[in-house]
Amino acid sequence: MAIARDGNVIALKENDEGFNHSTLLGVYVDDLLKENDLTASDLDAVAVSMGPGSYTGLRIGVSLAKGICFGAGKPLIAVSTLAALANAVAQREDEEAFYCPMIDARRMEVYTAIYDREGNVVRDIHAEVIEENSFADLLSTRKVLFFGNGSDKVKEVLKHPNAVFINGVSTSAANMIGLAERYFEAGKIEDVAYFEPFYLKDFVATVPKRKVL
């Protein structure tokens, strides 16, 4: 979670220790605002990840963002997690390549999309099971930069010389800021009452097996 002013991060709180969204997010909001002598009324807008990602995490994050927007009368901005990752990497790599963010799904499956250097969508967001011929059509034409927490597990599968893997790129509120400000300036805001995150896959509830002692 972050607070930004004029495109710069002025406060950031992150946690990667597990699924603690329900207990941490509300605390982080209060802490960030208090530590910077702000209230929700001082915000221009609230940006939230629209997905894809964890069903529970997206649901809790969007619900909290909606609550702030309703309570303070602020606009809601939705940013694709994959687009945010691609934009962040494109800003620092500055290379005419295809940008392929990957979010880990399960086994050899990832949530992914393809963007060009300017952020235009080359291949829409989708779930894909990675095998050795994945992205062969793109890799035959230019470099493809792979990054995100889903890219680590496919390094040994995608062996093409044009496949470049960038380490240390993770989902972060800080990566959303550039696109969020761009959308805000363009008036690209969501209907707070009806906005729903992009889960990509339907949620399937499971019942844990009973442990045998």
Which sequence ranges carry the predicted segments?
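Surface "functional belts" at beta-alpha junctions
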Residues: 8, 20, 75-171, 199, ...
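Stable alpha-helical structural segments in soluble proteins, enriched in small hydrophobic residues
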Residues: 32-36, 71, 89, 173-184
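N-terminal beta-alpha supersecondary unit
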Residues: 1-50
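Acyltransferase
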Residues: 166-213
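A general structural signal for well-ordered alpha-helical segments in protein cores
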Residues: 22, 26, 61, 65, ...
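DPxDG-like acidic metal-binding loop motif
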Residues: 47-81
